[in-house]
Regions:
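Extended, charged catalytic domains and RNA/DNA-binding interfaces, predominantly
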Residues: 1-229
Length: 229
């Protein structure tokens, strides 16, 4: 956006944050960057209108099918799509580095791996320790399973020091336990999981993994957007 920060942010926390990370969906870097470059494309206009509308209809009819399709859609040929993805990933890296203030405010390079099998959330927020990160953002098109995601983090990050990363299960309250299933995992895969997934998101604006709908207890703090355990 070309808007000044004062035009974008209408509220401010009383106590500043110590750190932040922007975890955009890596799967749509290519599409979003194409639409940024050529917003007059019909599909790009439809996306922009749905985003501006901020409605359930826009999410259900436009964004949700895009998220769960599991198919790369850049509106351009494969090579141009790859270039577009890489360009936006680099812009994300540069933005995080530009905002970083060592010792005062830490901004992490980050992205979201967005696998949604059967419309369930197995998503992970990938938070990197520094700007030494994989050349391409880890995504569920190229790494469609949790196992291939961990292996990619090992090969493209951990084996390439000083790259380091944590993978945080995100919105797992609508994943029906899929983010934590270990059936059939080898000792090596269990080791990778233990290495990368050292914490889990418990509470965020789309739900809380501490809440269980339909249970015998009542918690007023859970009375929002709770769809699945």
């Amino acid at each position: 956006s070309s808007s000044a920060a004062s035009d974008v942010y209408k509220r401010q926390l009383q106590r500043p944050l110590d750190f932040a990370a922007v975890t955009d969906h890596a799967e749509y870097f290519g599409l979003i960057n194409v639409c940024r470059s050529d917003p007059q494309r019909p599909y790009c206009q439809e996306l922009a209108e749905a985003a501006a509308e901020k409605s359930r209809r826009g999410f259900v009819e436009i964004f949700l099918p895009l998220i769960v399709s599991g198919e790369r859609n850049c509106l351009v040929d494969a090579a141009s799509c790859s270039d577009s993805e890489a360009n936006l990933w680099q812009r994300s890296i540069d933005a995080a580095e530009a905002a970083n203030q060592p010792g005062k405010f830490t901004t992490f390079v980050a992205s979201e791996w967005t696998a949604s099998p059967d419309n369930l959330h197995w998503h992970r927020n990938l938070i990197y320790a520094n700007a030494n990160v994989p050349k391409r953002a880890i995504n569920s098109f190229d790494q469609p399973t949790q196992e291939t995601m961990w292996q990619a983090l090992q090969e493209q990050c951990q084996d390439q020091p000083p790259c380091d990363v944590v993978a945080i299960p995100h919105n797992s309250n609508i994943g029906l336990g899929g983010s934590f299933n270990t059936d059939g995992h080898s000792e090596k895969l269990l080791g990778l999981r233990a290495q990368f997934e050292r914490l889990v998101e418990i509470h965020q604006h789309k739900g809380s993994s501490e809440c269980y709908p339909g249970s015998l207890y009542s918690d007023e703090a859970c009375n929002f957007e709770i769809a699945l355990p």
